[in-house]
Amino acid sequence: MNSRTVWHFAYGSNMNRAQMLSRAGKILEEHNASLPNYEVRFNKKVRGGTAGANIQPSSGKTVHGVLYKIEEGAMRSLDRYEGVPEHYRRIEVQVTPEGGQTVPAQIYIASRIEKGLRPSPNYLQAILDGAGEHNLPASYIGELKTAAGAA
């Protein structure tokens, strides 16, 4: 049986490989990648009044993250975990893997945003661990800390 696959671009805690495996079950491929003209914001309200990661358009900025190739069923599992459509909506964007050609990928964008939020220390650490695990640029990791109010 030949399952259909999809590319998913992770920019938050799903960059953490162990977490992504626990949610998707299986990763077929993974690559560092970038999404131009967007930036990460911590403006998605989650339980406890803390912030979840979100992205929004921002000319000249770049979001670095991890591009995962997964089966469609795994994407549906992620949708359930992320709370689509109540908490996040899934859209398609064009991302560029390191050293590769641009590909269409699925991402999550917060359905509702709120200003003045900060991520919990554990959540931020999961993001930073994933960024470090994939050797994302140190300057970008600094941008994540600044966006989280932790710099």
Q: Where are the regions that the model predicts?
A:
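Glycine-aromatic micro-motifs
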Residues: 1-151
